[in-house]
Amino acid sequence: RDRVYIDGPYGLFSHLRFSEAQEFIMIAGGIGITPMLSMLRYMADSGDQRKLTLLWSNQTPDHIVLPDAFEKLAAQLKGLRILHVMTRASEYSGERRRLDRPKLKRLLSDCSRSAAVLVCGPDQMMTDVYLWLVSLGFQRRMIFIERFSL
């Protein structure tokens, strides 16, 4: 007989820490979408009408989890804009290849530099995105990164 221990959740990765923010940007890499989905559901359930940008990087469209859930959220959250970037999808007609500073600058060009930014994904992606965001004028105190690797 096996035993399973469940512990947590831990940490403070939440949009609620930025209650004064008028705009949110969520940047996720792969399964880093998990906490973003939870926050978006909370925002939808509470009738949040702030401007939201979700930038989600995946290898291919087949790696997009729960597409129906995101369509439903987009219908509920009128301020939500979902941007996909595919890193390994040569046939994909949208944004392709890994995120880099020029792509991030272009994709977030209409976002306020005082927006709250939440980032979750692979370590190197989060490090790079943080540095690019700061270099693009986003406020350090408004950028929050969730590291989930050990």
Where are these regions (language model features)?
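FNR/FR-type flavoprotein reductase catalytic core
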Residues: 1-150
